[in-house]
């Protein structure tokens, strides 16, 4: 259905081999909301995966990608996606079963044993600067010496995808950047909201202050307290966090901040 070349038995074998070679933190990516998939199918998938005790699980709702055979089958009506309520029930089922198995939810789609969270992704969600080396790699740095709220917050760039282009830029000035984007303070504040609210720990007010020079209420106070009154956000341990209902309606919540 998804064009994968492996079966579950191959996955089990790969996990066992990884452990034999000393790898102690193993993640498994799962997709729910597939055409023809039932709630019982999804429960069986979760039980099968939990039987090999992964340290980390990422569970994503299916997003059909244009150009794939699955996308074409959905377009011409050969296949259809499950009802949104069924997909939401599958998500709730994953949260419940994974929590019972000792994998706590630390981000909308990610679950881990304590101490086994994905530090790589957490870096993106908390806007930690990063340097990408090689073809098509992306980088982000904060602008130094920012002294007011109008200076650019950060710069992002992407390296060329072809070796010839990459090498030519290295020879020319030593900086192989193909796409460069300057992030304004306003854009950076929204990205902080968007990324931090993905995490169950939420948007810590002190962290926002350190990044942007003011608490989030300066720019978003009316929105934050309105969403809190609607039961979509809560203020917990000095952090603004999505409630369980807010996680279901995350896209609608973010639209409020975009407006």
What are these regions (language model features)?
Residues 228-238:
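A short, conserved structural fragment
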């Amino acid at each position: 259905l998804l064009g994968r070349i492996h079966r579950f038995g191959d996955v089990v074998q790969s996990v066992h081999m990884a452990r034999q070679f000393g790898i102690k933190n193993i993640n498994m990516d799962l997709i729910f909301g597939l055409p023809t998939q039932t709630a019982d199918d999804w429960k069986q998938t979760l039980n099968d995966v939990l039987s090999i005790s992964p340290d980390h699980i990422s569970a994503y709702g299916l997003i059909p990608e244009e150009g794939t055979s699955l996308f074409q089958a959905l377009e011409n009506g050969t296949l259809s996606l499950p009802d949104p309520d069924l997909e939401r029930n599958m998500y709730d089922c994953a949260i419940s079963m994974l929590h019972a198995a000792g994998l706590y939810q630390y981000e909308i789609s990610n679950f881990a044993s304590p101490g086994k969270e994905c530090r790589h992704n957490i870096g993106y969600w908390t806007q930690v600067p990063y340097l990408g080396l090689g073809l098509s790699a992306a980088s982000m740095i904060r602008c130094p010496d920012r002294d007011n709220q109008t200076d650019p917050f950060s710069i992002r760039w992407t390296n060329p995808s072809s070796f010839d282009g990459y090498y030519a830029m290295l020879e020319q000035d030593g900086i192989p950047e193909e796409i460069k984007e300057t992030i304004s303070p306003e854009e950076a504040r929204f990205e902080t909201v968007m990324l931090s609210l993905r995490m169950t720990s939420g948007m810590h007010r002190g962290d926002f202050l350190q990044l942007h020079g003011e608490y989030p209420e300066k720019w978003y106070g009316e929105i934050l307290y309105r969403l809190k009154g609607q039961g979509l956000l809560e203020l917990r341990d000095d952090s603004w966090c999505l409630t369980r209902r807010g996680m279901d309606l995350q896209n609608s919540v973010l639209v409020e901040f975009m407006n």
